[in-house]
Amino acid sequence: MDPLTVYKNSVKQQIDSADLLVANLVNENFVLSEKLDTKATEIKQLQKQIDSLNAQVKELKTQTSQQAENSEVIKDLYEYLCNVRVHKSYEDDSGLWFDISQGTHSGGSSDDYSIMDYKLGFVKGQAQVTEVIYAPVLKQRSTEELYSLQSKLPEYLFETLSFPLSSLNQFYNKIAKSLNKKREKKDETE
């Protein structure tokens, strides 16, 4: 073959190769554009989900806040009705526990006001035979407060006790009745 034909064939082959390369690049560009559009659509959908979930979180936070407020209102109501305040509740391996203050407003002088702090525990077990544990909390009481409590409450209420759940109402009534007693005056000789 003559050199011109060889050169012509070589150029034609390069042009065909370049056309094939351009066609491949156009095809790859199209595929990548489709993927990009798909990813953009996915991103929009995910952003909508995120916005929806954020709205749900905000609503749940509002509900939680309202429930906490309602819980405090209920605690306040119980305190006004029964002079009982549940400060904290928690659960451990042994059962469900409550930190409680029970007091009285006898309407008299402020020195006749008494509060008994205690823990009540409901031991895990069968519901019919649930055992209640009572543990007085006296550590942060002044001598005067302890004297006032001792003058009103039976001695056994200064010790840890256990009793069946069915007796809980009697227990509450005993403490309430005792705390409502008028304070016995100290002997002047003490």
Swiss-Prot record:
GO terms for cellular component: chromosome, centromeric core domain; mitotic spindle; monopolin complex; nuclear envelope; nucleolus. Pfam families: Csm1, Csm1_N. Present with 1920 molecules/cell in log phase SD medium. The gene is CSM1. It comes from Saccharomyces cerevisiae (strain ATCC 204508 / S288c) (Baker's yeast). CDD domains: RWD_CSM1. It is found in: Nucleus, Nucleolus; Chromosome, Centromere. This is Monopolin complex subunit CSM1. Component of the monopolin complex composed of at least CSM1, LRS4 and MAM1. The complex associates with the kinetochore. Interacts with CDC46, CDC47, GIC1, GIC2, MCM3 and NUR1. The lineage of its organism: Eukaryota, Fungi, Dikarya, Ascomycota, Saccharomycotina. Keywords: Centromere, Chromosome, Coiled coil, Meiosis, Nucleus. It comes from the Eukaryota. GO terms for biological process: attachment of mitotic spindle microtubules to kinetochore; homologous chromosome segregation; meiotic chromosome segregation; meiotic sister chromatid cohesion, centromeric; meiotic sister chromatid segregation; protein localization to nucleolar rDNA repeats; rDNA chromatin condensation; spindle attachment to meiosis I kinetochore. GO terms for molecular function: identical protein binding; microtubule site clamp. Component of the monopolin complex which promotes monoorientation during meiosis I, required for chromosome segregation during meiosis. Also plays a mitotic role in DNA replication. Residues 31-70 form a coiled coil.
